[in-house]
Amino acid sequence: ALIEDPKEAVAFVKQPHIIEKRKELRENEYGEERYVLLDERSGSLESVKNQILKLIKKYDCKLIVIDPVNDLFESCSLEQQTGFIKFLKTVIKDGVSIFNVCHLTKGKTQTDRDGNRIVRRLTEDDFSGVSNLVKSGGCNIAATRDKLAEDETEQNSTDIEVLKCRWSGNTGYAGSWYYDNLTHTLYDKEDFMEKQRSNF
């Protein structure tokens, strides 16, 4: 179910049974962390496949995050990249979720008639690498930030947009995050700004 009201969303995640589910997601029945970090940037796609299978079989991993997947594809042929994506699809069929963090192609800076920089919205065509990765995704989410903005608030804001979501069909703007440099904390931007206004 889609919860659009932020207060309702917070109330939902604070329910005792949801807190218990979050703990269950984070820890196994012995209180051990469920997360395993694998740093395999220099390995071949074949060695990464083997490591992923090890994570699934040895550690019973149900969620694999590849960040960034673009690094794995450097110096690989299109055929090798496509083969790796097919491998990921077989893993998904076994009940494992895959999150591929994908860098974007750097587009040219565009300006309007007055010379002001135009920040354009991203599309699935902006994802760097093999197009099968984007086409195969169950949900494609873009996170963008205007690092060159003159306003510090805008410079530290990241906008989230759902470009595709197979299970719900809901797409579009999904919210913004604000990174506060003073506290080194990431906030929901709307909540942070509301809190700032109420402090004055």
What residue ranges belong to the model's regions?
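Phosphate-binding active sites in nucleotide-utilizing proteins
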Residues: A1
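C-terminal regions of RecA-like/P-loop NTPase motor modules
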Residues: E4-V36, L45-I66, L78-E79, T90-D94, ...
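Active-site flanking residues adjacent to catalytic metal/cofactor-binding acidic residues
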Residues: I66-D67, C102
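Residues immediately C-terminal
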Residues: D71-E74
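Short, conserved SAM-binding segment of the class I
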Residues: F87
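Conserved H-loop
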Residues: V96, N100-H103
